[in-house]
Regions:
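S-adenosylmethionine
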Residues: 1-350
């Protein structure tokens, strides 16, 4: 309650200080904290007096600790990023992590066109993406917007829309999406293939695959087949049996903190190291399943080098018959919209 009250008093201009104090006190009484209500009242009124007197909160002199405090990030995470990507990138990421992300859509080119959607939706085109648009206003629940029930579009961040095209999937091919749920990239792959061929969507959680199937059904995509399996152990699957492999691996999610406000507090210093081990396993398994002339995309929604270039460069070094097909893609969280993503395209040397 004190945190909420101080947030309103210090940072929210539209909430009168008196209302912030009285609301917090009333909530304390309702939540069986009646004996502490005078404490809440006293602390918040003292804060109001300090603000009116022109006083400000003490700010740490250390730039890393100040950044962590100002943007509500764990101290260890700021220190880690500061050392890995530098102060400027860390400051930009911290600022972007507290913005309200825009709501981006991807046009289902098999059922509509971006031009047609723009005529019926409060949206503008994302010029850098052939099928992307972003809503300019939210009027009611998404399922009530034009074209939703007809499967003409789905929700997908503009950065995520950059991943599936890197596979360059072709009609008639067999494609593996090894960490598929909830299915945004799975359905994008199927659309790019003209719904011709087979997209095998794998996830370790059967319930999450139900969401993949539901999305595919709404979008009218028939080439998607779901299979519950642990993608770190696909040794029983036939080697070199897929034309394309997408590995959108589990990661720290540092590129999507704006969408998951609590994620920053769930991360642990040793968690990234554990994730890197998992990512290595997934890459080894996915590579084994790719045909000799195929194309593999390793992707994350993080900006941590250990999970990105660290994983793929180690793989290429350990497997000399593999190479980068093109320079890796690093997208940084953008305050104007767009999550942080990384993608590397790998193939066997000919």
């Amino acid at each position: 309650l004190l945190h909420v009250g101080l947030q309103q008093i210090l940072l929210m201009d539209r909430v009168p200080a008196s209302a912030a104090v009285s609301t917090a006190v009333e909530l304390a009484k309702r939540e069986r904290l009646q004996r502490l209500a005078p404490v809440v009242n006293g602390v918040l009124r003292a804060a109001v007096r300090a603000v009116e007197a022109g006083e400000s909160l003490p700010v740490p002199s250390d730039p890393q600790k100040r950044l962590a405090l100002e943007h509500s990030l764990p101290d260890w995470l700021v220190a880690e990023l500061w050392g890995q990507i530098g102060p400027e990138r860390t400051e930009a990421l911290a600022a972007a992590s507290n913005r309200i992300p825009p709501l981006d859509l991807r046009c289902n080119r098999l059922r509509s066109s971006r031009e047609a959607l723009l005529e019926n939706l409060p949206a503008v085109a994302l010029e850098e993406l052939p099928d992307g648009l972003t809503l300019t206003s939210r009027a009611g629940p998404l399922p009530q917007l034009a074209g939703f029930s007809e499967g003409q579009w789905c929700v997908q961040d503009r950065a995520a829309q950059r991943i599936a095209p890197l596979l360059d999937p072709q009609p008639g091919q067999r494609v593996l999406d090894a960490c598929a749920a909830p299915g945004g990239k799975t359905t994008h792959i199927a659309e790019l293939m003209g719904d011709q061929g087979e997209v095998v969507a794998v996830d370790v959680a059967p319930r999450r695959l139900q969401q993949v199937s539901a999305n595919a059904e709404r979008l009218g995509l028939r080439c998607i087949r779901t299979e519950a399996a642990d993608a770190t152990d696909l040794t029983e699957w036939e080697a070199e049996s897929f034309d394309r492999v997408l590995l959108d691996v589990p990661c720290s999610g540092l590129g999507t903190l704006a969408r998951h406000a609590d994620a920053r507090w769930n991360l642990k210093p040793d968690g990234i190291e554990e994730l890197v081990g998992l990512q290595h396993q997934l890459l080894e398994q996915g590579a084994r399943l790719l045909k000799p002339d195929g194309r593999l995309v390793y992707a994350t929604c993080t900006v941590h080098p250990a999970e990105n270039t660290g994983v793929v460069e180690a793989f290429v070094e350990e497997n000399p018959d593999w190479q980068f097909s093109e320079p890796p893609l690093q997208l940084w969280p953008d305050p104007q919209g767009g999550d942080g993503f990384f993608a590397a395209v790998l193939s066997r040397r000919r």
